[in-house]
Amino acid sequence: CQCRRQRQMCIRDSSKGDVSTAELRLDMQKAMQKHAAVFRNTEILDEGVKKLGDIAMDMNNVRIQDKSLIWNTELIETLELDNLMGQALVTIRSASERKESRGAHAHEDYPERDDKDWMKHTVMWLDEKNKSKLGYRDVTLSTLTNEVQSIAPVARVY
C-alpha cells in the first residue's frame, strides 16, 4: 500500500512536463488499436512494442496542473492512464512473444495453436520505468477437487 501511495504522490508532484494526459491516452489508444488488434503479425507487433515503449516514456513528461488532493480529476485520469499504460505494455509485449494463435490472439504468422510450446500463462513484471521482465507459469489442467471432471483443452472453432 505504501508503494502505491508513493507512486501516486510521485506522479502528482513531478508532473511538470509539457504533454497532457489526454494526449498520451489518445496516443496509447491509437497504438493499441493499430498494433494490438485481434489479427496481428510479427511486423505490426514489433512496431507496436517500440511505439508503445516510446509513448510510455512520455509518462515522465506528463503535465498535471492541478496539485490539489480534493476533486482532482486531472490527477485521477493520470493515475488511470499510468495503470492502463502498464496493461498495454504487458499486452503488446506478451502478444509479440507468443508464437502461435490462441483464443482472442490470432497471429497471422503463426496461425496454429501450439500446445507443446505455448500451453502456459505469460507473466510479466514492470519496474518503475515501465521496463518489462517476461516469465511463464504452467497451466493447471486438473480441478481442485474430485467433484467435477477435468476437461481436456481443445482448439476453438468459429
Task: Locate each region found by the language model.
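Glycine-centered secondary-structure boundary/capping sites
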Residues: 6, 37, 150-153
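C-terminal amphipathic alpha-helical interaction region
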Residues: 61-158
